[in-house]
């Protein structure tokens, strides 16, 4: 989701590109999905292990940072909901601060409903080295907050 200020002809082009990206999977992606489904016994275990490694690293690291925490051990997907209540910030303000000062994108928990207030969501879809850098930045921001 986003906004664009541009002449009408550019907006129409951007809209067409966006619709193709969002609503239709390119044939190359469809073929990759078919291959992955047909070979899931080979493809899935290393992917599961890699995401498990990322999630456990992220959860352990978050719980070492002042004023934030996460339920441990993580279960399920590659998203973590980080408890930011101790910061005294709203989830929107916390997500904004983390983006502005740490240059790490999170989503405010209240985007997922009222019960998400007091949390931000982070995706652990990048490698552990990138996660380490992100959490180093977040830790610095939290210590200064």
Region locations from a protein language model:
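Conserved core segment of the aminotransferase class I/II
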Residues: 1-52, 61, 142
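Conserved glycine-rich beta-strand-loop-beta hairpin in the small C-terminal domain of fold type I
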Residues: 30, 34, 50-59, 71-83
């Amino acid at each position: 989701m986003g906004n664009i200020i541009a002449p009408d002809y550019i907006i129409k082009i951007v809209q067409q590109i966006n619709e193709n990206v969002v609503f239709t999977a390119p044939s190359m992606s469809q073929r990759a999905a078919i291959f992955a489904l047909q070979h899931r016994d080979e493809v899935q275990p290393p992917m599961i292990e890699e995401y498990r490694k990322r999630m456990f690293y992220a959860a352990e690291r978050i719980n070492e940072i002042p004023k934030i925490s996460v339920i441990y051990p993580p279960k399920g997907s590659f998203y973590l909901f980080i408890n930011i209540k101790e910061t005294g910030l709203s989830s929107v303000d916390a997500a904004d601060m983390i983006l502005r000062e740490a240059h790490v994108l999170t989503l405010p928990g209240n985007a997922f409903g009222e019960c998400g207030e007091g949390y931000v969501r982070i995706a652990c879809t990048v490698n552990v080295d990138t996660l380490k850098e992100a959490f180093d930045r977040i830790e610095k921001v939290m210590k200064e907050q």
